[in-house]
A protein has these predicted regions:
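Conserved glycine-rich SAM-binding loop
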Residues: 202
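Class I S-adenosyl-L-methionine-dependent methyltransferase catalytic core
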Residues: 1-197, 205-238
Length: 238
């Protein structure tokens, strides 16, 4: 056998077919069971390229037993417990998580270069004016929830509208958004090699979309039940 390291040996100049295409590295996907505000303090300024977040915004019903909030076609929100609490999409809750305060938004803007905030119309006191909002047409029909959801963005482009195109099965979180919505957001607003942040991971749709798109991702979820559910959902997807 010839010594291929001998300088007198001429190697073939043609590269084998399998070596012509360099396979992309598998994107990292790190999620933590942790309070996001405390966690963000560990990161340097502008550590993340794009934050896509869906914070809660103080929705509760009170203690009216068996009270139907929605009198429409689907009755998506219904009182279910004698001391209060309600159901959304099959999930029983006492109330939706408390809305984030000024400290949260201060840290969010510090650690990320650009931001997309779902429910931005509820947080106008924390967000600067923007010309670029995203409107997601959920095509809900007759029920308590709005026909659309709005997302504030830090970008300077025009308002964009996304229509519901598919109904995803396997709902694991009451405010779960579909993967295709995050697919679209990443295609429109993220750049190659961007590091994506989600402070309220919930169902993990953003995580799956980032993995599909080849983006490195960091997410936080404070609720252990939802953390475990999204972890299973992500691993099942992989």
């Amino acid at each position: 056998m010839k010594d291929i390291f001998n300088e007198n040996v001429s190697l073939k100049t043609e590269t084998p077919a399998f070596a012509k295409h360099v396979l992309p590295a598998v994107p990292s996907s790190e999620v933590y069971l942790e309070d996001c505000v405390k966690a963000l303090k560990r990161f340097n300024d502008n550590h993340f390229d794009l934050a896509i977040v869906d914070p809660p915004y103080d929705f509760s019903i009170g203690n009216k037993t068996n009270f139907y909030v929605s009198q429409g076609k689907y009755n998506k929100v219904q009182e279910t417990r004698p001391k209060g609490g309600f159901k959304i999409g099959g999930n029983y809750m006492d109330s939706i998580e408390k809305a984030p305060n000024e400290e949260y938004f201060k840290e969010l803007f510090r650690v990320s270069k650009n931001q997309i905030v779902w429910g931005g119309n509820y947080f106008t006191k924390h967000l600067p004016p923007s010309t670029c909002w995203i409107t997601w047409d959920k095509m809900n029909g007759e029920n308590y929830f709005g026909d659309c959801e709005l997302a504030w963005t830090s970008f300077g482009s025009a308002i964009r509208k996304v229509k519901k195109v598919v109904h995803e099965k396997g709902r694991i979180h009451p405010t779960q958004k579909p993967i295709y919505l995050y697919d679209w957001i990443l295609q429109q607003y993220a750049k190659p090699n961007d590091l994506i942040l989600d402070t309220h991971l919930g169902s993990g749709s953003s995580r799956i979309a980032a993995y599909k798109g080849g983006f490195n991702f960091v997410g936080f979820e404070i609720d252990q039940e939802y953390y475990e559910k999204q972890e299973k959902r992500f691993n099942d997807f992989k």
